[in-house]
Amino acid sequence: MTELWRLSATDVAHLVKTRKVSAREVAEAALQRLDAVNPHINAIVDCRPDVVRDHADQIDSVLARGDEVGPLAGVPVTIKINTDQVGFATTEGSRLQENLIAKSNSPVVDNLLRSGAVLLGRSNSPTFALRWFTSNLLYGGTHTKNPRDPQLTPGGSTGGGAAAVTAGIGHIALGTDIGGSVRYPAYACGVHGLRPSLGRVPFYNASLPEATIGGQVMHVVGPIARTVADLRISLSAMSVSDPRDPWSVPAPLDGPPMQLRAALCLRPAGKHVVPEVEASVLDAGRRLADAGWVVEEVDDTPPLNESAEVNEWLWLADGFEQLASAAEREGDPGALAVVAFAKPRTKTYLADAVASALVQRATVVRQWQLFLNKYAVMVIPVSAELPFPDQLDLQGDAAFQRVWDSQFLLRATPALGLPILAVSTGLVGQTPVGVQIIAGRFREDLCLRAGEAIEARGTPPAPIDPYTSP
């Protein structure tokens, strides 16, 4: 049999539910894989084998009684360090929160446990989830490495989760996204990541203060995985509505039939992208056309400059001073670089900036919804560049500005509240590349259908051994 850690989550769940393998066997394989490769990439910062084995044994006990288990039966899943999990610190990569032990699970963690998942460990993140690179001072000052190439960023802020999935440490990673933190790590590591619609997956951290307005409107939780099918089953597991999240909506996972029509935009909002990224979008379009989709290249998207402005308003005008103060007390170079870049921009925002942003958001979202009533999906680049050299944002003001500008399409989209899938289209040499697929609100099914068509006509990501210098 193929080594268990190499299998898809879908295949693992089937084997466990049919009792061809035990959840304990899967857990032991995952722990062995973690021990073998995690020292090379620092993806998982807190793993407690006894807890992992206990989760697995509970699944096996349920099956032994003849009872039903959920869609993720026995599947090892990693949890990001900014998400409440009972008995673990919700550190957000900060020494200030090293002892902030969660007394209850976030709703999405409860959903994963009810689905039969085995929680393998806590994945690394930059301090306060502020960067598209993954390092912090809390965990020994080391940073997470991209398994494909340690010279490239693994992405952020769910860099640990994406690196783990890529290296076969677990089958699914739970991530969060307010500015690309699920989508960019998936892109950088050459796997897939889904940013669900606002309200699709419930989230709440009882260990932390109430979220700011920007966080409530733009922050979502989603999965990273090696196959689109695994994103599909993990989304179904995560999406059970929960009253602790006021934005949570019990929406159906599948919407009404719609013509399979995709809009392709190579340079949204007129932004320059490198030729390799443009070629990836065209390649995705060809694969969709081959799968029977009607594909049309369009000159531009509905408003993105205005949506990016909303994102920035909501981030800088609400709670930024508290965040800046925490970053200064923490002293993390990456967090301080973000604060130094952003602080001068806060002076442009008036007292009513949040209200103005929410008014503008309504106009922008309306135009996107009307567009996506005509097209099932929109396909655009993830980033203007291939994955960055690691820690590029710490190389001075010009380098930070380059990163900020290149990530426009990740920053501009969260305020829309729409589902967005980052799907890998393959490699340029040994460097990952991919596209974003956007659909109407609660139409993750259309994102996933398009993603499956693209994946099926390429080479689906498979777990790899981390790259090490010869």
What are these regions (language model features)?
Residues V52-D60, G116-A117, P126:
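Long amphipathic alpha-helix in the N-terminal Rossmann-like dinucleotide-binding domain
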Residues L72-V221, C265-R267, A317, V382-A399:
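Short glycine/serine-rich loop/turn segments
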Residues L72-E92, Q151, P256-C265, L314-Q369, ...:
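Short helix-loop capping/hinge segments that flank enzyme active sites or metal/cofactor-binding pockets
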Residues R19, A30, G74, R114, ...:
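Glycine-rich, small-residue loops and helix-cap segments
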Residues K20-E28, D57-D60, P275-D299, L323-G331, ...:
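Acyltransferase
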Residues R195-D283, P302, G458-P470:
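A short helix-breaking turn/cap at a secondary-structure junction
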